[in-house]
């Protein structure tokens, strides 16, 4: 049985403006409309994510397998996925047409490298489908999602450039189906993905970035260090860096070889809660405990296995990602930096 982790559901109001034109006395007049609605701004989920230093045409088979594995895992939950985006920011209701579009992105195509675009066309490479992406999600706040975004293909890719695949499950899914079900899903998704790094573990799915919601979430994230709030994407240029410490930590080349492989990890990790499992293709997964844990610092539950792995991986961890806040919000930057090092200090 999974541990009794806390529920986190933060409700709030979202405001945004849309623009259009209205004909008044024969003239088109620009109109600004304000939209206001309530939604869940933060909720607890299990997040699975992989950082893939490869172009789309090398990933198609693995991404299709990961998607099919996810769909099988959530079978029996009608409405879990009800909307989608595909190679465009606007979302649509998920119909057979939507599935056709997503499957089309996973059909092999002749790669076109970014260098092959004429200068006047290069800025439209994303719209041309050079970096295919799609997202599947359910009604707001239900915790189900699947997302894939390929990197732009270069003949010599910039080192930080990666494609990213991620999925989330509500924690209720973990409780209903059990830890083994979620563990097997993460392992099955990983099995055909040539990842550099990746993880599976507890996270807070945020509508707004953490620095805009710190007042709402401060108590939760400092009390429960097992909740991740860093939602890295392909825009962040993760390269081969490790994005924090989680329940299941997937490592591939070059980080794994620099740590001495699975044998080197076993020799340096001594927590009884830690297991190191070798995978095909010079990869491994480090699992911290039988189930994901949020921890509770008020009860002395500081997650020592997480802290031990953090010390080992510190040279390979992603640098603090919110340093730009130092000028406009130094207090927020300082607090988030303290959270970022919660397993190191």
Task: Locate predicted features.
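C-terminal interaction module
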Residues: 2-88, 208-345
């Amino acid at each position: 049985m999974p541990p009794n982790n806390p529920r986190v559901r933060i409700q709030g109001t979202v405001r945004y403006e849309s623009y259009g034109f209205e004909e008044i006395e024969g003239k088109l007049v620009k109109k600004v409309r304000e939209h206001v609605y309530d939604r869940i701004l933060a909720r607890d989920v299990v997040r699975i994510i992989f950082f893939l230093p490869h172009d789309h045409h090398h990933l198609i088979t693995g991404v299709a397998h990961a998607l099919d594995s996810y769909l099988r895992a959530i079978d029996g939950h009608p409405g879990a996925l009800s909307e989608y985006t595909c190679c465009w920011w606007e979302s649509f209701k998920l119909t057979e047409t939507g599935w056709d579009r997503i499957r089309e992105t996973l059909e092999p195509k002749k790669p076109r490298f970014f260098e092959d675009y004429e200068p006047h066309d290069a800025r439209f490479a994303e719209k041309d489908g050079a970096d295919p992406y799609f997202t599947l999600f359910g009604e707001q706040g239900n915790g189900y999602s699947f997302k894939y975004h390929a990197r732009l293909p270069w003949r010599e890719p910039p080192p930080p450039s990666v494609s990213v695949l991620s999925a989330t499950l509500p924690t209720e899914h973990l409780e209903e189906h059990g830890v083994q079900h979620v563990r097997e899903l993460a392992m099955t998704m990983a099995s055909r993905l040539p990842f550099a790094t990746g993880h599976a573990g507890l996270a807070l799915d945020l509508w707004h970035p953490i620095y805009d919601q710190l007042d709402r979430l401060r108590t939760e994230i400092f009390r429960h260090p097992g909740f991740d709030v860093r939602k890295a994407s392909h825009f962040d240029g993760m390269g081969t860096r490790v994005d924090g410490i989680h329940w299941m930590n997937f490592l591939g080349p070059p980080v794994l070889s620099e740590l001495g492989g699975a044998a080197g990890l076993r020799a340096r990790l001594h927590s009884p809660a830690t297991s190191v499992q070798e995978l095909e293709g010079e990869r491994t997964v480090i699992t911290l405990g039988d189930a994901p844990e949020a921890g509770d610092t008020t009860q002395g539950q500081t997650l020592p296995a997480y802290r031990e792995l953090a010390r080992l991986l510190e040279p390979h961890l992603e640098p603090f990602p919110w340093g730009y806040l130092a000028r406009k919000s130094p207090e927020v930057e300082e607090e988030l930096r303290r959270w970022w090092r919660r397993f190191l200090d």
